[in-house]
Amino acid sequence: MLKTNVYDMSGKLVGEIELSEAVFGIEPNQAVVHDVVKNHLANCRQGTQSALTRAEVSGGGRKPWRQKGTGRARQGSTRAPQWTHGGIVFAPKPRDYSYTLNKKSRRLALKSALSAKAAEAAIIVIDEIKMEAPKTAKFAAFLNAVGATGKTLVVTATPDANVVKSGRNIPGCEVTFANVINVYDIVNASKLVLDKAALATIEEVFA
C-alpha cells in the first residue's frame, strides 16, 4: 500500500493519503517513456526550416564562360552549389515532424513516469493549491516551505489564473493541470507538486 504525506501551503503536515497502486506503483517501463518523450518533442517541432536549391535561386541562367578553350573547369551556372550565392544541395524544406503513438503506450508511459517519481519520493501532495491573487514571492515561499527545490511541476485539478500567474515567473517552475499532464513535463521535473483534487483526477482517469 502506497501512502504519502499531505501538507498545506505553509508546509505544515495535515495528514496522509493513499496513492493508487495502478498509477503510482507499477514497474516503470523506461523504453515506452523514452518513446513518448521523443514523440512529444517531435510533435513540438515547428518544421519551418527552408532554403533554396539551385533551381530556386534567382539568376544564373547564363553560362559563365564557354565550355572549352579557357583552361578553366566547365561551369553551367553561377547558381550551382559550389558557387558563392549558389543554391543549397538537398535544401531543407518545411515538413511536419509529428507522428502518433497508440493510446496504450501513452497511458503506460504516464503511469511509468508517475511511478518512478513516487519511487524517488519526489511527489509532494498539497491539501489545496490556491492563491487569492497573483503573488510570485508568496508562491515561491510556498514551494520552498514544502521542499520543492529545483525544477518543479505544479499540478492543479482545474485552471487557476492566479496560480498560473504566480508560478510562471519562477525559474524552473511549471504550472499545469491534471487533464493535460504529459510525460515530458513529469520526466523533466525534479519534484511533482499536486493538490488532492488533481491527484483524484489523475487516478480517476488512469487507474
Region locations from a protein language model:
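Extended polybasic, low-complexity segments that bind anionic RNA or targeting/receptor surfaces
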Residues: M1-Q46, A91-A207
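Glycine/serine-rich anion-binding loops at beta->alpha junctions
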Residues: R54-F90
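A short, flexible low-complexity segment enriched in Lys/Arg and Gly/Pro that occurs
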Residues: A31-K68
